[in-house]
Design a protein with these regions (language model features):
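Extended, compositionally biased repeat/scaffold regions that form elongated interaction surfaces
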Residues: 1-136
Length: 136
């Protein structure tokens, strides 16, 4: 079990809230970004962004780049470089942020992430079969 801030986890919601159904999750210790699609499947990608790269990797909106609506840093680089990801996820309404506290519990079929932010706790179940669920 991983507990606390020693394993930073970032989150970005995509689409229109408050009932978001697509996310990007960044696991700092793994340098992986998990993309949670609206069809309840997920894929992971290596986070290759670093401080020497632009904060905004692309700007398909033809407006001055800002976040929101554009994802930035590692989320933005992935959003810009993976084919069809922009169409599948859309843009963001809120700036990416780190979970204030995280608990990650691995189990035989996958893992459960608890993300504590402000007065909200969200639980994400990432299954080894490539499916995910937001537990309420």
């Amino acid at each position: 079990v991983s507990v606390g801030n020693n394993d930073p986890v970032g989150i970005n919601e995509f689409g229109v809230g408050p009932d978001y159904n697509r996310f990007m999750l960044w696991f700092g210790s793994e340098q992986q970004i998990y993309v949670l699609f609206p069809d309840q499947t997920w894929q992971s990608y290596r986070d290759t962004w670093d401080e020497s790269q632009p904060e905004f990797s692309c700007n398909p909106l033809n407006a001055p780049p800002s976040s929101p609506p554009l994802p930035r840093r590692g989320f933005g680089k992935l959003w810009c470089s993976v084919e069809n990801l922009q169409e599948q996820l859309g843009t963001i309404e809120r700036e990416e942020r780190l979970c204030q506290h995280t608990v990650v519990q691995s189990f035989e079929q996958g893992r459960l992430l608890a993300c504590f932010e402000d007065a909200t706790i969200r639980y994400f179940s990432l299954m080894n079969d490539g499916t995910w669920e937001l537990l309420r």
